[in-house]
């Protein structure tokens, strides 16, 4: 792991506040949002965040948006989303690809520009439409004879370890063996995630973070999608009977892994000066953040490396954090990192996680920040921590404070 400097953000020249944090619902694969391009989902999230914050589009200094599966999306996806949300064409935009951590890294980059004094107000988040990801054909030189092989863009650019050529699920199997996490453990974790997600939706705990998406239809009125779709697409009693997906003797199944999804999320970041100047209302403050990396095959436990760095920068320990959001790329990821970090499972992903809600790659890192802010508000809590792994062996983490 690389060396790091323990510097608290609040001791720097700029404090970074979050003045809005929203997301679209997450659509099931080939579901209700499958026809809405990632950049349109991003635009909807950005527009919703701007409206929620009261920030006028012309006040935004820069935009960072995560997007992983970019083939066919078109040039400069972040700019497409920004312009679609009504931002001026003079606002610089950058698209970030750190696989599943893209959305969180976008927020980190946005915060850094504010701390450096380059910006006062930044839009940051992520977006993905996995349903629209194309298949690839290597036909540049033509095919003289024989069949043409097509590659799945989702697998090629999102779910395959580029070094060992094995799927992410194979890495998850190795993690389960290393930490003695059984199939039953993972199935129970998944069932808990689904139950928590359903209970949270029934109690209206997700309502405050959602920006509905109006989906045009060939005939008739548009259909408005205002709820996550994935958590209802399950029969809990069938989970224990599913076959392993990556190893016939393995423990990872379609049910205890996250799903393929479509969605976007966006946060509005502002300096203390901007908050005071424009009369903005902070909902959270960024206390610290960190990245970490290790062997790509062990991306599954990389959050357990990034989280301690973020905590050290904040001058905190795990005991100082009231609630956590850890990405549930697989149930084993949540279980392993909770175990390694010594966290209380009752304080982690309390409203369900990606196994039940969905995991649109470019949005996942910023989505858990959106949810974490709302969890802190719902429980009148102060400190929240978030961690997310990413393919290639990396992870990002962030500590926030409720305002």
Predicted regions and their residues:
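Active-site pocket-lining segment
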Residues: 171-173, 209, 217, 287-356
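Active-site-proximal alpha-helical scaffold in enzymes
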Residues: 96-128, 176-205, 266-273, 338, ...
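Active-site pocket-shaping loop/turn-to-helix segments
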Residues: 24-50, 69-71, 94-108, 120, ...
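Condensing-enzyme catalytic core mediating Claisen C-C bond formation in acyl metabolism
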Residues: 9-36, 234-301, 305, 370-371, ...
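Phosphate/pyrophosphate-binding loops at sites that engage ATP/ADP/AMP, CoA/4′-phosphopantetheine
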Residues: 48-61, 175-180, 275-279, 308-323, ...
């Amino acid at each position: 792991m690389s060396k790091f400097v323990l510097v608290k953000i609040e001791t720097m020249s700029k404090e970074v506040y979050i003045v809005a944090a929203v997301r679209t619902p997450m659509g099931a694969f080939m579901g209700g949002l499958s026809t809405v391009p990632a950049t349109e989902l991003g635009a909807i999230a950005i527009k919703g965040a701007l409206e929620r914050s009261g920030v006028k589009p012309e006040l935004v200094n820069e935009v960072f948006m995560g997007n992983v599966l970019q083939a066919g999306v078109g040039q400069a996806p972040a700019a497409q989303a920004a312009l679609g949300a009504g931002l001026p064409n003079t606002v610089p935009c950058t698209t970030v690809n750190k696989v599943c951590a893209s959305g969180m890294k976008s927020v980190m980059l946005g915060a850094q520009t504010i701390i450096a004094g380059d910006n006062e107000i930044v839009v940051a988040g992520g977006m993905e439409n996995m349903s629209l990801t194309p298949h690839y054909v290597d036909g540049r030189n033509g095919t003289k004879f024989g069949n043409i092989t097509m590659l799945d863009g989702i697998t090629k650019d999102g779910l395959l370890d580029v070094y060992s050529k094995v799927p992410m699920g194979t890495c998850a199997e190795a993690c389960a063996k290393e930490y003695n996490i059984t199939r039953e453990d993972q199935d129970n974790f998944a069932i808990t995630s689904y139950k928590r997600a359903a209970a949270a939706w029934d109690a209206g705990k997700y309502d405050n973070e959602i920006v509905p998406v109006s989906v045009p239809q060939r005939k008739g009125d548009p259909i408005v999608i205002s709820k996550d779709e994935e958590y209802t697409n399950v029969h809990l009693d069938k989970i224990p009977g599913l076959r392993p997906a990556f190893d016939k003797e393995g423990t990872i199944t379609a049910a205890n892994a996250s799903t393929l999804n479509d969605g976007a999320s966006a946060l509005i970041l502002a300096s203390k000066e901007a908050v005071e100047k424009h009369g903005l209302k902070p909902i959270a403050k960024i206390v610290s953040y960190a990245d970490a990396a290790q062997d790509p095959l062990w991306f599954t436990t990389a959050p357990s490396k990034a989280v301690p760095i973020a905590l050290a920068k904040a001058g905190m320990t795990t005991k100082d954090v009231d609630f956590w959001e850890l990405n549930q790329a697989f149930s084993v990821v949540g279980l392993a990192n909770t175990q390694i970090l010594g966290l209380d499972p009752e304080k982690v992903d309390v409203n369900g996680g990606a196994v039940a809600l969905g995991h649109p790659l470019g949005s996942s890192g910023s989505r858990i920040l959106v949810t974490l802010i709302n969890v802190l508000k719902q429980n009148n809590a102060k400190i929240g921590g978030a961690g997310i792994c990413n393919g290639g062996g990396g992870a990002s983490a962030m500590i926030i404070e409720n305002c």
